[in-house]
Regions:
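N-terminal pre-core extensions flanking Radical SAM catalytic domains
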Residues: 4-98, 259, 285, 305-339
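Conserved glycine-rich "GG(E/T)P / GGGxP" loop and the immediately following alpha-helix
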Residues: 67-251
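C-terminal accessory region of radical SAM enzymes
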Residues: 206-256, 286-336
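Nucleotide-sugar-dependent
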Residues: 262-264
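Short, small/polar residue-rich loop motifs at catalytic or cofactor-binding pockets
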Residues: 266-269
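Short, acidic, Ser/Thr-enriched surface-loop or helix-capping motifs
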Residues: 275-276
Length: 339
C-alpha cells in the first residue's frame, strides 16, 4: 500500500489512547482500503479487457458471441417505418416517414431473435426506431410476443409520443409482456418557437395520466425538463418532456441545434445495437439508413450477415478506435453529438 495512505491512516488513529483499539481501527482501515483497491483494480482490468476486445480484429465466431454478450445492454429494432409526426428536432422533419409504412421483414426480425437466443441474451430490447410503435398496435403486440418466446428473460421497452395511447392499448401491452414504456410529451414539436412553459406542460401531461387512470409522481423537474414516473402492473412508465432547444441532439448532423464540438469519448457503439426497418445495422441510435449523409456510418445488413459478425467487424472497430479517444475532436456525423 502507498506510504502516503499508511501515514494518513496513522494520523487518523494516533489520538486513540488505547493501543489495542488504535491498532484495531488502523487494521480495519487498511483492510477496507485494500479491499476497495482490489475491487477498483478488477474494474479497471475488466474495462481494459473489454476495450481490447472491442478494438481488436477476431475471426472466431464463439469469441465474437462472447464479446457481444459481455458488452451489449440494448438492442434497438425498428419494426416499421411510419411516424405520424414531423417534429422539428427529429430527422423525420426532413425525411419522409409519413407517406408509406414499410415493415421490417418478419424473417429478418426472427433471424435477429434467433441469433440473440443463441447467446441467451437477457438485456434490453427496444421495439422502435424513429417510428411511432403504437401506430400499428397489432404488429407491435405480435413482435412483443415473439420476443418473449425467443428471449423470455430480456426486458422489452417501447418509446411513444402518446398520440395513440389509451387504456385499451395499455392493457394489451401489459398482457403481451412489455417491461417499460417511455412516453414523450412534445409540447413544441410543430413549432420550435413555443417556449418551455412548465406549469402548462405539467397540466397537459396530467391529462394523459388521468385518461390512462394512472397515479404518478414527479421524479425530476428543472427549467428545461420534467420527468413523471408511474407503474401499470409490471410496466414501468416514464413520462417526460424536454426543451429540445436546449437539450436536443443534432442526430448525426441532420438537425440544427446548439452544441459544442465533441471531444469526449463515446461508448454507444460498444453497448448498443441499432437496426432500422430495412435491416441495416447503424453505428448508433443517431445514425439512420435513410439519411444520405449517414451512408458511411452503416455497418451492414443483418439479413445477409450475422449480428455478431457485424458487431465485431473491421468497419465498426475503426469507428470505435476513433470514438474512444478522449480529449480529441470527433469528426463527421459525430462532430457535434451531445449524447
Amino acid at each position: 500500500m502507498n506510504e502516503n495512505i499508511i501515514k494518513l491512516i496513522n494520523d487518523i488513529c494516533w489520538w486513540i489512547p488505547f493501543r489495542s483499539k488504535r491498532n484495531l481501527l488502523r487494521n480495519q482501515l487498511i483492510s477496507t482500503i485494500t479491499d476497495n483497491m482490489h475491487v477498483k483494480n478488477r474494474e479497471i482490468y475488466q474495462f481494459i479487457k473489454k476495450t481490447i476486445d472491442l478494438t481488436t480484429n477476431c475471426d472466431d465466431l464463439e469469441t465474437k458471441k462472447r464479446i457481444f454478450k459481455e458488452n451489449i445492454c440494448l438492442v434497438e429494432i425498428g419494426i416499421f417505418s411510419y411516424c405520424n409526426r414531423k417534429c422539428w428536432f427529429c430527422p423525420n422533419s426532413v425525411i419522409d416517414r409519413h407517406s408509406d409504412n414499410i415493415q421490417l421483414k418478419e424473417e429478418i426480425f426472427l433471424k435477429i431473435l434467433n441469433e440473440l437466443k443463441d447467446i441467451n441474451y437477457s438485456n434490453g430490447i427496444r421495439l422502435h426506431r424513429y417510428n411511432e410503435p403504437l401506430y400499428d398496435i397489432e404488429l407491435l403486440i405480435k413482435r412483443i410476443k415473439q420476443v418473449k418466446e425467443y428471449l423470455p428473460n430480456c426486458k422489452i421497452q417501447i418509446n411513444t409520443n402518446g398520440d395513440y395511447l389509451n387504456l385499451e392499448y395499455l392493457i394489451d401491452l401489459k398482457d403481451a409482456g412489455i417491461d417499460s414504456m417511455l412516453i414523450n410529451y412534445y409540447y413544441n414539436g410543430s413549432d420550435k418557437n413555443i417556449e418551455f412553459n412548465l406549469p402548462q406542460i405539467k397540466s397537459n401531461m396530467n391529462k394523459l395520466m388521468q385518461k390512462l387512470k394512472l397515479n404518478y409522481h414527479i421524479d425530476n423537474e428543472s427549467d428545461n425538463s420534467i420527468i413523471m414516473k408511474s407503474k401499470y402492473y409490471n410496466i414501468d412508465i416514464t413520462y417526460s418532456s424536454i426543451n429540445m432547444n436546449i437539450l436536443g441532439c443534432d442526430r448525426g448532423g441532420v438537425i440544427d441545434v446548439k452544441s459544442k464540438i465533441r471531444t469526449a469519448p463515446c461508448f454507444h457503439p460498444n453497448m448498443q445495437v441499432s437496426i432500422d426497418y430495412d435491416g441495416i445495422y447503424t453505428l448508433c441510435c443517431n445514425i439512420r439508413s435513410d439519411v444520405k449523409e449517414h451512408e458511411n456510418y452503416l455497418i451492414g445488413n443483418v439479413e445477409n450477415n450475422n449480428i455478431f459478425e457485424l458487431f465485431t467487424s473491421d468497419k465498426i472497430i475503426e469507428f470505435r478506435k476513433h470514438l474512444l479517444r478522449g480529449n480529441s475532436k470527433k469528426i463527421g456525423a459525430c462532430t457535434y453529438c451531445s449524447m
